[in-house]
Amino acid sequence: MKNIRLTVWIGIMCGWLAAGMLQAGTRPDNARPAEEDGSRLWLPVMRPVEGAEVEVIYKGKVSPTIAVAIAELKNAWKGEPVLLEKKRTGQGDGFAITSSEHQVRILSSTEAGLLYGVYSLLRMQAAGQVTVPLSVTEQSVYDLRILNHWDNPDGTVERGYAGCSLWNWEELPGTLSPRYEAYARANASVGINGTVLNNVNASPQVLATGSLEKVKALADVFRPYGIKVYLSVNFASPIQLGKLDTADPLDKEVIRWWRRKVKEIYTLIPDFGGFLVKANSEGQPGPCDFGRTHAEGANMLADALKPYGGIVMWRAFVYSPTDSDRAKQAYLEFMPLDGQFHDNVIVQIKNGPIDFQPREPYSPLFTAMKQTSMMVEFQITQEYLGFSNHLAYLAPLWEEFFGEVRPDRLKAVAGVANIGTDVNWCGHHFAQANWYAFGRLAWNPSLTSDRIADEWLRQTFTSQPAFVRPVKEMMLQSREAVVNYMMPLGLHHQFAWGHHYGPEPWCSVPGARPDWLCLLYTSPSPRDRQKSR
């Protein structure tokens, strides 16, 4: 009963919030200004800055990134003059903010770091945390903080619940939507510095020359915001695109084909990030098709990328069609390969051993592999947590993970994006909080869910305590509510077949994998579980 009351209470609170916004004068969606329709996210609306009274000082050539930083300050800063200064403050894109009665100084070794410092200052202003003197020093825990888009060439998004793909491939490279820059701005504001543009179930055509020219157009938009582009690649591309007879990673012609293709990419996009690969999983081709290991496949691609500084993110989401317990499959396949991957390969592992369930133990690979670079893959889109219909604040899920897996065990962090063409970007206003929380935790995994929710609410809606306090409480309890109704008694896979929305504990599909069916987990005896097969 307690769980039912909590769920009903959350629904009532959502209704109260909506009613309150309407009473405040909110018009229907198709008539709302940007301040109210969700399109501005948690950021100030950008307005013309000509004649702005804010004084920003930068002694040096104003690059596109510095121009963005200056524009953000002139648009929203309400304090003393700001000095931006490139000065060594630590490694990577860290920054320092200091102040006196007459000036605020933002220092960083990099231009991207200065931009992050600007967004941090504006975040503190929105939260009412700017005091004199200021003394803030921040350093990102992970150098790579990457969104993974499961976007397809036809404009659909796998497990997407916020409209169509943000990327209008048919209009690129000639037409650039203003949302591309707005997307880059939102990512930079929370420290996200990379994006994989396409689905891990990748089409070989993404590597065709015409497609790469479209990717270049996006990379050019994102670059001033410190964001690199990456691509998911199909391991069989040498066969399907290059017309070779094989994709064997040890074949000389295959190696030559990949090296030529990588050279073509870097000629167009000098700061290209690298490849994300889903191989030998759910029907996708991979090195195992040719009697090779995951390490041999990943290393071949890594060798092609290394002269340009590129990386390979090789997914560990694999399971054998003949084994009924997929929870152990990634461990069985990757643990024997520990220490065999090249230094520019990162094994990308889902946070849990099953598949983004509302609650899972962490994957054992995170603590077992000692000689391999690893990164965690979270799912920001709510495949198993109510799509974009349910309020489910996911920071507690990720905070739970970082409480078990030491951040220094990881090299990078990835999140499967929840972004689409909906006017509010994420299909549900509160789903924006998960995009925001992912970026903040990827920058600093020691942040609390409470603090992140507080930041997001104050920047997105209002700082009034009468609003922030109850709505934050609702957010902080929402994930546990989803766990209780999606995983009763800790049982997973009680959801509907295929789309994963809503309950279907009676599900029985002839010929389906036993571990995809509810009966495997709910039947009282081995004999009954056998019937699910």
Predicted regions and their residues:
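Conserved small/polar residues in nucleotide/adenosyl-binding loops
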Residues: Y521-Q530
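Bacterial N-terminal signal peptides
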Residues: W9-G20
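Bacterial N-terminal signal peptides that target proteins for export
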Residues: K2-I10
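Feature activates predominantly on carbohydrate-active enzymes
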Residues: S63-E72, G90-G94, T98-G274, K306
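Catalytic-core regions of glycoside hydrolase
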Residues: E171, K243-D454, T460, Q464, ...
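Acidic, contiguous N-terminal accessory segments
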Residues: A24-V104, S109-A112, V130-P133
